Amino acid sequence: MEKLQYELQGYLEIERYRKQRFLYPLLFREYIYALAHDHGLNSSIFYEPTENLGYDNDNKSSSLIVKRLITRLHQQNHLTISVNDSRFVGPNRSFYSQTIPEGFAGIMEIPFSMRLVSSLERLTKYQNFRSIHSIFSFLEDKLSHLYYVSDILIPHPIHLEILLQTLRTRIRDAPSLHLLRCFLHEHNNWNSLITLNKSISIFSKENQRLFLFLYNSHVYECESVLVFLRKQSSHLRSISSLAFLERTHFYGKIKHLVVTLRNDSQRTLPLWFFKEPLMHYVRYQGKSIMASRCTNLLMKKWKYYLVNFWQCHFHLWSQPGGIHINELSNHSFHFLGYLSGVRLTPWVIRSQMLEDSFMIDTAIKRFDTIVPIFPLIGSLVKAKFCNVSGYPISKSVWADSSDSDIIARFGWICTNLSHYHSGSSKKHSLCRIKNILRLSCARTLARKHKSTVRAICKRLGXKLLEEFFTEEHEIVSFIFRRTRLRSERIWYLDIIRINGLVPHS
């Protein structure tokens, strides 16, 4: 594999030296598919159904399949491709629609991946920035000093042609873009709009890598203006701002975007607009938060600027209510499964001056994170752990498993929820969710043995409960006193994805 990476990097260096960006020829290189497979592609897409190739044995090598694919690509004229082409209908169509998009997505990621690696070499704590909880530690440090917050939804739907035009600004390989256009034209209504939910059905499970590449490209372009604004403000060049850069997928075009957007933006807005010293931005998937210390009027200018920027540059119209501006002291916002906000904590300070003492009442701003109970119960209802009233019910589909397997499954869910929501400042909502899962586990066991919950709890005893306590709970108890453990927020830097039961949309 090192040889493949060396050969690939040598090819790209030659093309970079020639000041060309031709990625299309990589589709005809066998090592590209091996490299993409090694980096996490689903291996099943490299195997065409054996009845289509004339084989009776399902264990044939994938290298032969790739060679046949490359031969077909050489023979196929993509300028005249049609949805009615007999070579790509029936079983062959499935193979074409799976292998080509995944290979294309892997090739399109190559230039950005190499720039990403070179950028990460300068960061010694990159792993910490990958954690979702690092966002909250950043907000905890910054939001208590800010006044206003904007909840922003990245605009969609996206027209396919607009999306391709956006890609042309960063990918100058016309044959590759034409291949992508042919694929999208064949597998989707060209005049339709892609919404976040619709795109899941358009791009099948096998094509998720291509969809993620297109979606990340779209999101990056939508927030590219913020890269320019960050360059304009010297106050944003703090260590914490590295987290923003780490969560931007495509690094190599930052300088290019700054030059382009500077020329476009300075003609439409006065320069004083960018002099705001404290503007902070975080994003996860399609939801982003922008907070500032500026006035409500200036926040509205930010809102109108973003809406006009998306409309003029990308022909995207923000959804009604896509940007909400609220005062931090009076508003809490939903982000990554937490209900976050800034609340005033009253403090009484005793001041001693010689023989006189004074009691001073004051308030300190504190970043507050709460686990929203109703969205979590809604997730448990969808997963059939409880009803809409929060009353635990049995998980009937697990009733055929062994007792230890059932307990382990419920314990794993409870452990992950506790791990993710460890940053909550109030743990009573989390305790209620744990109780629902425990009783649901007991009811599932009672359903299996045709018994009662009381009899199951009496028979299993402590074994039924110990699975719902994590090892980290015991470790953290040595760090904090047990009286403070229920109120302390703990952020873990090993969480890189959200649990499926955590509502975050």
UniProtKB/Swiss-Prot annotation:
- Give GO terms: molecular function aspect only: RNA binding
Q: Name one Pfam family in it.
A: Intron_maturas2
Keywords, sorted A to Z? Chloroplast, mRNA processing, Plastid, RNA-binding, tRNA processing
Q: Which gene encodes it?
A: matK
Is Transmembrane one of the keywords UniProt gives this record?
no
GO BP terms, alphabetized:
mRNA processing; RNA splicing; tRNA processing
Per the similarity annotation, which family is this?
Answer: Belongs to the intron maturase 2 family. MatK subfamily.
Q: Which GO terms describe its cellular component?
A: chloroplast
Which InterPro entries does the UniProt record give? Domain_X (IPR024937), Maturase_MatK (IPR002866), Maturase_MatK_N (IPR024942)
Protein name (record): Maturase K
Q: According to its UniProt record, where is this protein mainly located?
A: plastid
**Domain of life of the native organism:** Eukaryota
The entry's function note states: Usually encoded in the trnK tRNA gene intron. Probably assists in splicing its own and other chloroplast group II introns.
Identify the PANTHER family for this entry.
Answer: MATURASE K
Subcellular location per UniProt equals:
Plastid, Chloroplast
